[in-house]
Amino acid sequence: MNNNHSYDDRSFHIPLHPSNTSNPNPNLQFALSSSYDHSPKKKRTKTVASSSSSSPKSASKPKYTKKPDPNAPKITRPCTECGRKFWSWKALFGHMRCHPERQWRGINPPPNYRVPTAASSKQLNQILPNWVSFMSEEDHEVASCLLMLSNGTPSSSSIERFECGGCKKVFGSHQALGGHRASHKNVKGCFAITNVTDDPMTVSTSSGHDHQGKILTFSGHHKCNICFRVFSSGQALGGHMRCHWEKEEEPMISGALDLNVPPTIQDLSTSDTSGCCLDLRLGL
């Protein structure tokens, strides 16, 4: 009996068409309907299509950077300082930074400003005759000398050389010759004579030795034959050679008498005895 009642009860009736049933939650139904109407796949296809369609347009329009053409016509007015013209006002404004000495800013000078212009050749021809009339004779002579110097061609100036009279070696200065003359300590009468040569490199780069072999020069260097030290000039070598000469001449100087120094007691005694001997010998 209970089982028959359960089958006859309409509350347990299952509908065959769920679409006809009303949804108890209207918000859920609106969300489901909106999700079915706007699918994310369609949005992706639209965005891809729009990007693909816009890409050839962007590729067809490359970025254009304008570069200044030096051969382009100058459309601006000239610079008030140097007179140069430019192809754009922006270039002219940038160029005005090269003139920081001007008294104003910008490209427009003050209304009372006058640009100093150089005098033309015609104006100079008109001014010079009037100026010449005020010149004195000395000014004329100085001006003529300056004109001769400016118009004259540079003459081939001869180089003065100094030759040693003993070994006929030629040097370019008095100092070098003086150092070389010191090497001729045993040669007397070594004097310098001026010799003018056209080739300045004939002697300065020569290498060899003099007739006594005292000084050896290799590629412009002077070598001492005693201690074999090398010097860059003959003057330096001559000053160095004096050290060896003073050492050699010391014993000779010690044995000689110096008249500027008073004699000692021992010297007086020897001189007296020597005088007596001389008198005795003369008497005999």
Swiss-Prot record:
Region annotation (Disordered) ranges: 1-76
Compartment(s): Nucleus
Gene3D superfamilies: Classic Zinc Finger
GO molecular function: DNA-binding transcription factor activity; zinc ion binding
Bias (Polar residues): 18-37
Domain of life: Eukaryota
Keywords: Metal-binding, Nucleus, Repeat, Transcription, Transcription regulation, Zinc, Zinc-finger
PROSITE patterns xrefs: ZINC_FINGER_C2H2_1, ZINC_FINGER_C2H2_2
Biased composition (Low complexity): 47-62
Biased composition range(s): Basic and acidic residues: 1-12
GO biological process, one term: regulation of DNA-templated transcription
UniProt zinc finger (C2H2-type) residues: 77-99, 162-184, 222-244
Inducing or repressing factors: Activated by the transcription factor DUO1.
Cellular component per GO, a single term: nucleus
One Pfam short name: zf-C2H2_6
SMART domains given in the database record: ZnF_C2H2
Tissues in which the protein is found: Expressed exclusively in pollen.
Binding partners and assembly: Interacts (via the EAR motif) with TPL.
Function noted in UniProt: Mediates the regulation of male germ cell division by DUO1.
PANTHER family in the record: ZINC FINGER PROTEIN ZAT2-RELATED
Protein name according to UniProt: Zinc finger protein ZAT3
Organism of origin: Arabidopsis thaliana
